[in-house]
């Protein structure tokens, strides 16, 4: 694996981890809270953002205006059944969600969830490293590169991995501060 390819794969893992972080509630209204909520729409699981305009009215309120009013009940049901712990208010045209402040206990749960997402991201990075190192060892065994080249490349791969793991740790720290901020 080339260094550029390794970094591209690791960047994808970082982006996936960030998307996971964005779905965690922080006590402030944020449209990305609903990214993981899907609606059973004509027999197919469809993301809410494909069915409606989602906007934040203020720091505590999210507004969902469906493109098709007939899916209003389905959207409301999906939000109610999600693990977000928020209750939608349906006025017949628009769904409003008041995002209540988080309790201390709920904040700790979300910090654990953020840690879990960070760990999943680190595992993905380590898998990319393992694949790259295995390729280096195979190339060395096949005589395509020298032992010294292989060791240098493996050392470089480890440095890249360490850099990306530190980036995930930084993002986790930022997310935890955001969650714990009252």
Swiss-Prot record:
Pfam families: RRF (PF01765). Its main location: cytoplasm. Gene3D superfamilies: 3.30.1360.40, Ribosome-recycling factor (1.10.132.20). GO terms for molecular function: ribosomal large subunit binding. It comes from the Bacteria. The keyword Cytoplasm applies. InterPro entries: Ribosome_recyc_fac, Ribosome_recyc_fac_dom, RRF_sf. GO terms for biological process: translational termination. It is found in: Cytoplasm. Responsible for the release of ribosomes from messenger RNA at the termination of protein biosynthesis. May increase the efficiency of translation by recycling ribosomes from one round of translation to another. Belongs to the RRF family. This is Ribosome-recycling factor. It comes from Prochlorococcus marinus (strain MIT 9215). The gene is frr.
